[in-house]
Amino acid sequence: QLHHGVDPNCLQEAFNQHFSGVSAIEIAMMEQKIIYEDDNDITFEDVLKLCNVHARMFEDQVTGHSAVEIEQENHPVQVFKAENMAFRACINRINNIFKALEALNEDDPSRLDFTDGLKRQYQLLGQFEHHYTRKERVFFPLLEKYGYNAPPKVMWAKDDEIRDLFQAALKQVDLLRSKDFTERLATAKLAFADFEYEFKEMIFKEEAILINILAESLS
């Protein structure tokens, strides 16, 4: 119904009644069935376009997995989650710098210092590339080994979209030293907001779905 334009909010109540306590593996199998079944008119592009909506509908229904090995300190999954926490903190710092820049007069000399600080935070946040590469080279092959081909395919495509959004946002920061600072700042903030939304949605998918599929598969 989502793929035919039905408002997700209209479906959420019925969805919660029928899919209470669904596991991450069940989500993966549903997604796989949608993508690979021949008797439906839903394309991969349709799934990609609505994957954030799909994930959010499952938000309160996904049951976690408390495998002991996943809780061990320095376990790859724990490192993965710690990195996401650091990325969230970096995003908060960037938004705080944007607020500070908006409060300054255009001729305020401290504007350049804040702009430099903003660029440094973008450079730190750009380390998500290592995070994504590890996910794609280590976690995705494990999922495929256990027969879950759809989640890696969808996530990898979204990863590439997020990479493009980050580069677009970074380009706008580089332009902040140009003329028309106020206008440039507004554009830079909007570009970052586009990236931030998709990036945080991916964090949710990683922690609510990807990690749980790995935990259930490896236990």
Can you describe what each PLM-predicted range is?
Residues 1-129, 133-219:
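Small-residue-biased structural context
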